[in-house]
Regions:
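Small-residue-biased structural context
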Residues: 1-188
């Protein structure tokens, strides 16, 4: 099982760089490309409810993915950047991210299955196959992305949290020692 893999000291900065770039790739390139190909492959000239639902489902998925990735970019990465500076937010930790982290690649599987099952075969079948191929690749890419988050990024951030907490405890003890010496001197 992946949870039994030994901890390896990884660069949290390199992981965040990879994850941020992956977010931009998905949101700014891969998904817009799929949508463009999807529009080319489906027949929007007819009043086809399946076509409308496929587009609506895809657009809803993209919005959900944007929300998910923007949360990570704005909150999770900011939290980790502060940790790297030795600043620990007492109201947040990486376990909160883990508890709320949903795997958004499942909806792509649903979309692919809806297209395969309900979209009528037409003269643009090759184009739709290209769309399905892109969706399949996105599924795999997002699954890999989630594995990097779950099995590399989260354990690395947990280790960083531990180090920052230990450092804060050590600094607190060191700060209290001179006070104790002063109190002993003044009581004598």
């Amino acid at each position: 099982s992946r949870s039994s893999l030994p901890y390896v000291d990884l660069s949290v900065q390199a992981l965040m760089h990879y994850l941020k770039n992956a977010h931009h790739y998905f949101l700014d390139f891969q998904l817009p490309t799929i949508r463009r190909k999807l529009l080319e492959a489906i027949d929007c000239s007819t009043d086809n409810e399946v076509t409308f639902l496929i587009l609506k489902f895809f657009d809803g998925y993209v919005q959900e993915l944007k929300k998910h990735m923007n949360y990570e970019d704005m909150y999770v990465f900011t939290y980790v950047e502060n940790l790297q500076k030795g600043i620990k937010d007492e109201n947040y930790n990486i376990d909160m991210f883990v508890r709320n982290h949903n795997h958004i690649d499942d909806k792509l599987t649903e979309l692919k299955n809806i297209i395969i099952k309900y979209y009528p075969d037409n003269q643009k079948a090759y184009m739709m196959n290209a769309v399905l191929f892109d969706i399949y690749n996105s599924e795999k890419d997002l699954a890999s992305h989630n594995e990097v988050e779950d099995y590399l990024f989260v354990p690395t951030v947990l280790q960083l949290e531990k180090e920052v907490s230990e450092q804060a405890s050590t600094q607190q003890v060191e700060a209290e020692l001179p006070k104790e010496k002063e109190e002993k001197k003044s009581s004598q």
